[in-house]
């Protein structure tokens, strides 16, 4: 029987107090309370399209702005993801996804490599989506990548509506993550690396 791939992480600093939980083999259920509505909407895309159960509770210094909240949630989720994934034996490791939303199209390619790296090629058509600063999208992914130790390439190939651009990115990320962590029946107990470790 396959072990449960889930984890919980708490992160407390002078800027944020965060508790996250993730189940890599979930059903897409999310319980999100970051205090930033649009960000919760994007995290829901990861859960729903990644078929992962994700819980986020955050109290952040939103009287300043959302930067610390978004970045620190990325860090905590990256830590929880790495913890839940365990030794990585049997996973597919590499994956990609293209997701459209009306005029927008994004591509996400990732490698659960053990080496953190982010290539973020997105030119948003405006600086804010409602009250949400679009610069924080890359901050979230940088925080996640650094602590999940994955290589992640994000490209928005086209788009005129900034909300659509962001949503296609998060949906594609969820779908690619789901595919990469999937257990390959031909790789049971095998590390997906010629080095023997990731």
Curated annotation (Swiss-Prot):
Keyword Chloroplast in annotation: no
Protein name: Imidazoleglycerol-phosphate dehydratase
Stated family: Belongs to the imidazoleglycerol-phosphate dehydratase family.
Listed transmembrane segments: none
Gene Ontology cellular-component terms listed: cytoplasm
Top-level EC class as recorded in UniProt: lyase
Keywords noted in UniProt: Amino-acid biosynthesis, Cytoplasm, Histidine biosynthesis, Lyase
Listed GO MF terms: imidazoleglycerol-phosphate dehydratase activity
Alphabetized InterPro entries for the sequence: IGPD_sf, ImidazoleglycerolP_deHydtase, ImidazoleglycerP_deHydtase_CS, Ribosomal_Su5_D2-typ_SF
Pathway: Amino-acid biosynthesis; L-histidine biosynthesis; L-histidine from 5-phospho-alpha-D-ribose 1-diphosphate: step 6/9
SUPFAM superfamilies linked to this entry: Ribosomal protein S5 domain 2-like
Gene Ontology biological-process entries: L-histidine biosynthetic process
Location(s) in or outside the cell: Cytoplasm
Organism field: Methylobacillus flagellatus (strain ATCC 51484 / DSM 6875 / VKM B-1610 / KT)
Main subcellular location of this protein, as a coarse class: cytoplasm
The protein's Enzyme Commission number: 4.2.1.19
Catalysed reaction, written as an equation: D-erythro-1-(imidazol-4-yl)glycerol 3-phosphate = 3-(imidazol-4-yl)-2-oxopropyl phosphate + H2O
